Amino acid sequence: MRHYEIVFMVHPDQSEQVPGMIERYTAAITGAEGKIHRLEDWGRRQLAYPINKLHKAHYVLMNVEAPQEVIDELETTFRFNDAVIRSMVMRTKHAVTEASPMVKAKDERRERRDDFANETADDAEAGDSEE
């Protein structure tokens, strides 16, 4: 089986359907003896340019190992699903399991925010004890 990176963008009005779509696609892959190495739901993001007069879309990234028949089926599903604005399936040489730069940046921002909140809480406690 080959390794693939799949990115698809969903219409922003259909964002509530994304978990169900992910579940269906992962079930199709695992049902055909495939493996999912990475699954990231990036959420609703700004598009670089308008697509069908839309400025935002819900992004999903999947790195999978699957037979060609399943990938063909997924591409057909993407093509005929009106909620999917764009999709891209790329073959990769090996499985990608580490977090994408999008998720890494989000985690770093969260860590910095938590560190800042802890520092301000410590400063407030230190100020209270001095008085």
Swiss-Prot record:
Compositional bias annotation for Acidic residues: 120-131
The record, for CDD domains, names: bS6
Per the record, residues carrying N6-acetyllysine are K93
Q: Look up keyword Acetylation and say if it applies.
A: yes
One biological process term in Gene Ontology: translation
Can you supply one Gene Ontology CC term for this chain's record?
cytosolic small ribosomal subunit
Q: Which GO terms describe its molecular function?
A: small ribosomal subunit rRNA binding; structural constituent of ribosome
Record keyword Transcription present: no
User: Per its database record, what is this protein's job?
Assistant: Binds together with bS18 to 16S ribosomal RNA.
Q: Which NCBIfam families is this protein grouped with? A: S6
UniProt family annotation? Belongs to the bacterial ribosomal protein bS6 family.
- Please identify the protein, giving its name as recorded: Small ribosomal subunit protein bS6
Which source organism?
Answer: Escherichia coli O1:K1 / APEC
Gene that produces this protein: rpsF
